[in-house]
Amino acid sequence: MAHTHCISGLVGKLVMESEVNCNADKYYKLYKHHEDLPSVIPHIYTSVKAVEGHGTTSGCVKEWGYILEGKPLSCKEKTTYNDETRTIHHMVVAGDLMNDYKKFDATLVVNPKSNGHGCIVKWTIDYEKMNEDSPVPFGYLACYQQITEDLSSHLCASD
């Protein structure tokens, strides 16, 4: 697991990369077809629904209920997909995150390992804090790490 941090004043980028022992396409598809996530990892996702567009089409808007550091939260985000590169980009447009951030984008990229066994899961958070008192979103990076591990365990168990 590798972490990278680039923080300058109110703007920052956090990156988390992790090797997992499951197929890249399966991992990407489970996250893209998001409806199952609350049943697979209910300790993180409490709900998800598409509120504009179809949930697996670029440009759709989804509402997520989730738990972060023991607190129930929600957000609305616009999602784009690139199936060729196994990339999902979430741009938060409303919800609890907007209390601390002017901008909060989370990007998931899933790449197969060169040896053909497993994949590399990379989460990148690009953010702009609302003000100096807003926290650096390390809690979200830890949450994405937990999601990565839990989805990998779920997929490995179902293989």
Curated annotation (Swiss-Prot):
Classification via InterPro entries: Bet_v_I/MLP, MLP-like, START-like_dom_sf
**Any one Pfam family match given in the protein's UniProt record, by short name:** Bet_v_1
What are the disulphide bonds in this sequence? none
Q: Which Gene3D superfamilies match?
A: 3.30.530.20
Q: Which UniProt keywords apply?
A: Cytoplasmic vesicle, Vacuole
* GO terms of biological process kind: defense response
Source superkingdom: Eukaryota
Major localization class: other
Localization recorded for this chain is: Vacuole; Cytoplasmic vesicle
| Organ and tissue specificity | Laticifer.
Q: What is any one of the record's Gene Ontology cellular component terms?
A: vacuole
Q: What does this protein do?
A: Not known; MLPs constitute up to 50% of the soluble latex protein.
**Which family does the similarity line name?**
Belongs to the MLP family.
What this protein is called in its record is Major latex protein 146
Originating organism: Papaver somniferum
